[in-house]
Each structure stands twice: as structure tokens, then as C-alpha cells.
């Protein structure tokens, strides 16, 4: 019954997403502009969704600039379905993009999305090209030292909210990799600065006493997938849902290894986070209140479910 209810909620949200309506303005305290987010209205219609009460009267820094300009500009690398990806018609979509739309609407401003390589999202925040970045980030100690990170948000069932991470390989290598130890000596691709880079380092390279494993970092997941297809590597480390989508689109060329990284090592860092420039506490505090409300209402689970369906990711 619980699964039926979730599928019903997801179906209702999907129907709402197909109606490209302009959202209502924020009911927050303080002086803000009415949020239209007209360019990205297709992402999410929030007009009938509950929103948290925010006091923005003492906004400072980037948050004040956002409110004054009426636009929240975010960076993303849209190669990480279902969180962020490009649809067949060329539009940016995904659960994190829906969340960003909801955040903008709660602030009463428009949303603007800048797409770029994953490594570029950090530079865009550093240089002030964007206000925030939403791009499938996990909590990492080195990130927390140089950026303001939001509270975590999860797209899975609250009873099993830890996301899984795995590796994919070619159909020719099917059955070759059955444990993490089997990847010792292999040539593995992972996206630079990603969580998967950390997982490979922590759980595969540490098993390699002779240094025979080659972890190669690439700028984009597309590079990794093309490399795997061309035989330049043996496997690619990915989020499990993203892995399923790439395998489904490979026309039988790739397979899931079904080998999972041990996520119990990182339980205290559960969930995905967004980031802003270090010191922008006014912005992060406001966004955290919004995300906490999203978690309370389980909105992100619904967004994630819809995005998975749109990305063609099957359970």
C-alpha cells in the first residue's frame, strides 16, 4: 500500500509538472520580488505546495543581491540523472533542478541555471558567477572547509535513505568483477572531485598493496562513458541510479557489476547538499530552512521519483 501511495503521489506530481504555470510569489516576511521563474516553470509548479515562513528582512551578502536582483542563479553539471540531466528536447531537468526552483519560489525570485562541467561548478561559485551550485554534491571534509554547505536532502525512502554507489563495466567483462577486491589492478574512471573518487580511493586503492590499480579522473561523466565504450578503462564508478540510466541507454554495451561501495563508512554524511561561497551564511541559513521544510514534507522524495521516471531509470 505504501508503494502504491508513493507511485500515486509521483504520478500526480508528474501531471502537475506538465502544466507550465507561473508560480505564485513568496509569502515571506521582508521585502522581496514576486517569483515568476518563467524560464523554468516547466520544472515544478509550486503554487499549491506549502512553503516555509522566512524572515528575509535582514538579508545580507549574496542573499541580499539575489533578493534585490530578483534572480537566483545556480550552476549545475547536467550529467547526473536523475538529479540533473538534459532531456531529449534539450531542456535541463532533474530532482535537484526542481528543488532549486522550489528554493527560488520560496525566496520570491526567478531561477537562472548555468550548465557547465562538474569542476567548473566550484569555480563558478568561487568567482561569483553564480549564487549557488546544485550538482549532486555529497558532504566532504575538504568541501566543508572552503564552501558553505546546506543541510542534506535525500531522494530515497526515509526508511532506506542511503544512496548506493557502484561500478559499471562492458558486457565483455560481465562476471569478472564480483567484489571490490576484484577491481584491484583495473583501470577505473571516476569524475574529478566526486564522491565516487573518494569511494574508489577509500575502498579499492587501499586494498591494492602493489599499486597496480589505475584511478583516472575525468571532467565529465560523458568522458567516462565514452572512455569505457572505447576500451580505455575497465569500469566507471557511479551513483547507482545514474549507473542504471547509462546501462539502459548503452544498447547492451554496458552492464552493472552489482558491486556496491560500503556506505556505512559515511553514515554521518547522509544526503546530497548544495553549496555557496564560504562566508555566505545569510544565504545558507535561508536555504537550509527551506530544505529542512522540504525534508519535513518529504517533497524531495516526490521530486526524485518523478525525475527517475523522466530519466527512464527503472527500479
Language-model features: where?
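Short amphipathic alpha-helical coupling segments at ligand-binding clamshell hinges
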Residues: 95, 99, 179-182, 186, ...
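Acidic, polar ligand-binding/catalytic clefts
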Residues: 101, 105, 110-182, 263-267
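Periplasmic-binding protein-like
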Residues: 155-169, 240, 248-291, 310-315
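Ligand-binding clefts/hinges and TM-proximal coupling segments of bilobed small-molecule sensing domains
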Residues: 26, 38-57, 61-64, 193-215, ...
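A ligand-binding cleft/hinge motif common to bilobed small-molecule-binding domains
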Residues: 120, 136-146, 199-207, 229-230, ...
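C-terminal motif of bacterial Sec signal peptides marking the signal peptidase cleavage site
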Residues: 19-23
Amino acid at each position: 500500500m505504501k508503494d502504491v501511495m508513493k507511485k500515486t503521489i509521483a504520478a500526480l506530481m508528474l501531471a502537475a509538472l506538465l502544466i507550465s504555470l507561473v508560480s505564485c510569489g513568496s509569502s515571506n516576511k521582508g521585502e522581496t520580488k514576486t517569483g515568476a521563474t518563467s524560464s523554468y516553470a516547466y520544472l515544478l509548479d509550486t503554487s499549491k505546495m506549502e512553503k516555509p515562513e522566512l524572515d528575509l528582512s535582514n538579508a545580507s551578502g549574496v542573499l541580499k543581491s539575489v533578493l534585490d536582483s530578483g534572480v537566483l542563479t545556480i550552476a549545475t553539471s547536467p550529467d547526473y540523472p536523475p538529479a540533473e540531466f538534459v532531456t531529449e528536447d534539450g531542456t535541463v531537468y532533474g530532482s535537484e533542478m526542481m528543488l532549486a526552483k522550489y528554493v527560488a519560489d520560496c525566496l520570491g525570485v526567478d531561477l537562472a541555471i548555468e550548465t557547465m562541467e562538474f569542476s567548473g561548478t566550484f569555480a563558478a561559485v568561487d568567482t561569483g558567477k553564480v549564487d549557488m551550485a546544485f550538482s549532486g554534491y555529497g558532504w566532504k571534509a575538504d568541501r566543508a572547509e572552503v564552501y558553505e554547505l546546506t543541510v542534506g536532502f535525500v531522494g530515497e525512502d526515509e526508511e532506506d535513505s542511503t544512496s548506493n554507489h557502484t561500478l559499471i563495466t562492458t558486457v565483455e567483462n560481465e562476471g569478472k568483477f564480483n567484489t571490490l577486491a576484484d577491481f584491484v589492478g583495473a583501470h577505473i574512471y571516476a569524475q574529478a572531485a566526486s564522491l565516487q573518487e573518494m569511494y574508489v580511493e577509500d575502498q579499492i586503492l587501499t586494498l591494492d598493496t602493489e599499486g597496480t590499480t589505475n584511478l583516472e579522473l575525468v571532467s565529465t561523466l560523458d568522458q567516462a562513458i565514452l572512455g569505457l565504450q572505447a576500451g580505455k578503462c575497465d569500469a566507471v564508478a557511479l551513483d547507482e541510479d545514474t549507473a542504471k540510466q547509462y546501462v539502459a541507454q548503452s544498447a547492451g554495451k554496458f552492464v552493472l557489476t552489482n558491486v556496491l561501495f560500503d556506505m556505512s563508512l559515511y553514515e554521518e554524511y547522509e544526503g546530497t547538499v548544495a553549496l555557496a561561497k564560504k562566508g555566505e551564511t545569510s544565504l545558507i541559513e535561508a536555504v537550509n530552512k527551506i530544505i529542512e521544510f522540504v525534508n519535513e514534507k518529504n517533497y524531495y522524495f516526490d521530486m526524485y521519483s518523478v525525475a527517475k521516471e523522466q530519466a527512464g531509470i527503472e527500479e
